[in-house]
Amino acid sequence: MTTGKEYVASVFEKVKAQNAHEPEFLQAVEEVFESLIPVFDNYPKYIEENLLERLVEPERIVSFRVPWVDDKGQVQVNRGFRVQFSSAIGPYKGGLRFHPSVNQSIIKFLGFEQIFKNSLTGQPIGGGKGGSNFDPKGKSDN
């Protein structure tokens, strides 16, 4: 019988191999996985049902361009992301982040954590997150 620690380690190795270029996402996954070891020790049925494999893979990731016109009339283009992680308990819910550092790894990390935040509300909502590397600082409303 597989222990919780063995299961978590095995799944995390697969996640690392598939997401090696996403350090923020991997850090969040590792922290959550470590905290779940006692759960898998107490409920081995979750291991049999591959709960972590289903939880850690987003249902959908959308990458898109965000064109906008600056105050000089020049078209600028930024990148946007929407990660929809889990609709198991309801429709996706999660905010938007606008910051120059935003990338797919950051949005995946935030969307992954949103699953757990939303589940604690008692509302039937799933987890997702969106954002863009657009920096709103110093931009006009024009």
Q: What do the PLM-derived regions correspond to, one by one?
A:
Residues 1-142:
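N-terminal ligand-binding/catalytic initiation module
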